[in-house]
Amino acid sequence: IVHLIMMVGGASPINPEDEDKVVDMLNSGLASAKQYGVEQVSSTSFEEWMQGEPQEGDAFEAAVAQVAKVHARCYRESELADSCVQGWHLEFLRSGEFQTFTSSAKAWQAVKAMNEASGANFFKLMVDAAHCGDSDLDIPENEAVIQELSDNGALGIFHASAKTTRGCLSTDDGWIGALLSAYARTGNMKHVFVEIFHHEDPALEALRELDSGHGIDTSDGRTYSEMVIDGVVDVTRRLNNFVSRGILS
């Protein structure tokens, strides 16, 4: 199963002047998804990575409206309603990586507007435990958003990833377990990914400059392949034990 993940660069989804550029970028990725029969697509197309300024108040509402317009255009122009693509999962990022859509609650407002603008319950919110843990919302507040997403048919892919370090899942300080459990209890959990970043990846130097915690070696003597395998085993055991406890069927 292939999942396509898209990013935007060189143009801002919240800037009306960049609308056509952003739509063209996303439509190009969606064309590839349709060509190869991809059923689930994802993107971080709320805003550009590590660019721009925080939008608050009326400016935030305008940003919500603009990203909704952009994604509704893509939905129509790429003819997603009659395609193999079954859902589009939007991922928010922590403060610093994003400036505006930096929590599950803020991102949910945008996803809700996307569905309203497209006239279809097509867009979902991807919830990454790492970005939730690095946001300004606590665990109960994120659990409440997860339930609201589920109630509205907008619960997307779950990323099992450790906050701040983005390394070994054992450094998550309880966020993965709590939010994965909240997902499972909705009865609408469908996709879970394990995500681990290399603490010396040259492409992620900007993250290490943003937060030195991202540069910590959490491997404990393992290769990164071994860390990913350990993460998959850990999450699999959690899911299997949700079944044993009657939380999942």
Task: Tell where the protein language model's regions lie, with residue ranges.
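A broad structural signal for short, well-ordered beta-strand segments within beta-sheet-rich domains
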Residues: I1-V2, V85, L155
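Short amphipathic alpha-helical segments at helix-loop
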Residues: I14, G52-Q55, F92, I216, ...
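Active-site-proximal beta-alpha loop/turn segments in soluble metabolic enzymes
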Residues: F46-A59, G87-T100, A130-H131
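Catalytic cores of phosphodiester-bond-cleaving enzymes
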Residues: A65-E97
